[in-house]
A protein has these predicted regions:
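One-carbon transfer enzymes
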Residues: 1-222, 247-269
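A short acidic-to-branched-hydrophobic micro-motif
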Residues: 224-239, 263-269
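A conserved acidic, glycine/proline-rich C-terminal tail/linker
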Residues: 234-250
Length: 269
């Protein structure tokens, strides 16, 4: 099957899986990235090594029409930033890292942890006019534990999503015809800066969720009139009488007292 692909490196394994499933990739779409928190190097390298045309500008209706006229049968989107036009006969599939219809939005992984959910998943759905609202083609749920972080959740998604993408490509005609409408759902805005902040007055439970939700991306500890950016840390739950905000070092690890625990700093940003 001839396809086009849109995305960046977070879900790059989907692109490889589609090729292994027998798809011929006709064109690759990505978007400009900072190559600090977001990358497109793997996607671009995939295209260049195979001589596949690629672009980092927005997909247009004209792009999709040309693909359709050239015999392309589908476009698969996995983490693509821009809105994909829907005025096209080309079947457009989006890979979304949440168990829709709950978790619509640009960055559902940290939201899953911040909300204390015990389940998430990956959903493949038709691209529709509303973000993440299209009929569901395939989805798979997986458990989320109290030890999961943004990094472990992302790795689970990077394992599940390619398998679903390959299965969708193999059975696209059948899945497209039997897709299930989502109905009412829940949209999660991208977390704001204040949601990434831990203060000495926070409960250990809230601090734990923040530290796990932004592990590897970074969060902020705000105390004593200063802000410190932390890349990785963890919260140790413990009863104590130490004043919140007090810092000590244990085994070479800096720790800040919280209400009901300690914030341990493993890596500064």
């Amino acid at each position: 099957m001839k396809i086009a692909y849109a995305g960046f490196d977070l879900l790059y394994p989907c692109l490889e899986a589609l090729e292994r499933a027998g798809c011929t990739v006709e064109r690759v779409f990505t978007y400009p990235t900072d190559n600090v928190y977001e990358f497109n190097r793997q996607v671009v390298s995939f295209a260049e090594k195979r001589g596949i045309p690629w672009t980092d500008r927005r997909i247009t209706s004209q792009d999709l029409q040309r693909l359709w006229e050239g015999g392309c049968q589908a476009l698969f989107s996995a983490g693509y930033l821009y809105r994909i036009p829907v005025d096209t006969p080309l079947r457009c599939v989006n890979v979304h890292p949440a168990l829709l219809p709950v978790g619509r939005g640009p960055w559902p992984m940290p939201c899953t942890i911040l909300r204390g959910l015990t389940e998430s998943g990956v959903t493949l759905h038709k691209v529709a006019a509303g973000f993440d609202t299209g009929d569901i083609l395939l989805q798979e749920a997986f458990p989320v534990t109290q030890r999961d972080t943004l990094e472990t959740l992302t790795e689970t998604i990077r394992t599940v999503a390619p398998r679903l993408a390959a299965a969708c490509a193999a059975g696209l005609d059948r899945l497209w015809a039997s897709a299930v409408p989502q109905g009412a759902g829940e949209y999660w805005p991208e977390p704001g800066e204040e949601e990434m902040v831990i203060t000495p007055e926070d409960s250990a439970r809230r601090a734990d969720r923040v530290a796990r939700a932004f592990a590897g991306y970074g969060f902020v500890y705000r105390g004593g009139g200063e802000e410190q950016r932390i890349l990785r840390g963890e919260v140790r739950f413990a009863s104590h009488t130490t004043r919140p905000g007090t810092m000590r070092v244990e085994g070479g690890v800096p720790m800040y007292a919280l209400r009901g625990g300690w914030l341990r700093i493993f890596q500064w940003a």
